[in-house]
């Protein structure tokens, strides 16, 4: 507790921020790129912490991510946006059956464009 926040690692800061944001059990938890700029190991730990806290507290959570594997593995609904509009909205068993490749195909089908940014394809 005596450590200065500025001296914490990125993952430690993300974890601390998540804990602070959920102390009062918010009506809606907004997570904007919660694993951005984190190495894969730390990102996995942060996602695990998110799953635990959200699950234990039963929080309604809206997570923004460009990582399609994370989008598929987290939550019960996936909304894909492009150029400011919703192009795909899926939930439940249909979402659970999807792969990153399925999402890429759906994006290309609906948008008419192919994704070429490796960051979006991580998984």
Give short role names for the model-derived ranges.
Residues 25:
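Conserved catalytic motifs of ABC-family nucleotide-binding domains
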Residues 29-32:
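Catalytic Walker B motif of ABC-type/P-loop ATPase nucleotide-binding domains
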Residues 65-66:
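H-loop/switch region of ABC-family ATPase nucleotide-binding domains
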């Amino acid at each position: 507790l005596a450590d200065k926040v500025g001296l914490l690692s990125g993952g430690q800061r993300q974890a601390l921020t998540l804990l602070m944001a959920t102390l009062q059990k918010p009506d809606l938890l907004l997570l904007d790129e919660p694993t951005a700029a984190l190495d894969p190991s730390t990102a996995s730990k942060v996602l695990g912490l998110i799953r635990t806290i959200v699950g234990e507290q039963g929080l309604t959570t809206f997570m923004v991510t460009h990582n399609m594997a994370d989008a598929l593995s987290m939550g019960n609904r996936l909304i894909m946006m492009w150029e400011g509009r919703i192009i795909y909205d899926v939930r439940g068993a249909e979402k659970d059956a999807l792969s990153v490749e399925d999402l890429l195909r759906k994006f290309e089908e609906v948008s008419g464009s192919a994704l070429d940014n490796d960051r979006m394809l991580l998984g």
